[in-house]
């Protein structure tokens, strides 16, 4: 794997999903562009041999099971939602870098001793609902569902 080329290609593809005429990105939580981007990341996870799954709010987890200590997990990632006309590296670079690092480690060393997970959080920006870190709050169990009035928008 050519790391630099892989990162560029993944960023280029993600940047095409939700791109706007001004050169920025608009991928609001649960929008069609956000969902398309999450599914692209899910496909990339599966392509490198990860088990990929969404939780109930749309956080996406890709996992490679550890060979010796599978219950111990090293997790890395970020988010792919944006504000209106957001930057092309904000959030998604962390997801792409994490995915590429796990791929590189697996190709070079094989199955890890500890489990590795890449996460693409459902939301960080707070651009869709009057709350921030919706994905993270759900992940750690401190979310207040009253902050998000219309949970029926969730269709992963």
PLM features per residue range, with description:
Residues 120-152:
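Flexible glycine-/small-residue-enriched beta->alpha junction loops
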Residues 154-156:
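Conserved small/polar residues in nucleotide/adenosyl-binding loops
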Residues 76, 85-124:
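Alpha-helical metal-binding/catalytic segments enriched in His/Glu/Asp
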């Amino acid at each position: 794997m050519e790391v630099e080329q892989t990162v560029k290609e993944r960023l280029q593809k993600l940047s095409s999903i939700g791109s706007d005429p001004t050169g920025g990105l608009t991928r609001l939580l649960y929008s069609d562009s956000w969902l398309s981007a999450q599914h692209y990341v899910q496909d990339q996870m599966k392509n490198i041999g990860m088990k990929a799954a969404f939780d109930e709010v749309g956080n996406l987890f890709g996992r490679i099971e550890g060979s010796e200590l599978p219950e111990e997990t090293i997790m890395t990632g970020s988010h792919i939602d944006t504000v209106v006309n957001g930057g092309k590296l904000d959030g998604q670079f962390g997801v792409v870098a994490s995915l590429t690092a796990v791929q590189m480690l697996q190709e070079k060393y094989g199955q890890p001793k500890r489990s590795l997970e890449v996460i693409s959080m459902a939301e960080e920006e707070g651009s869709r609902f009057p709350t921030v870190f919706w994905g993270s709050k759900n992940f750690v169990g401190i979310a207040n569902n009253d902050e998000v009035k219309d949970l029926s928008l969730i269709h992963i």
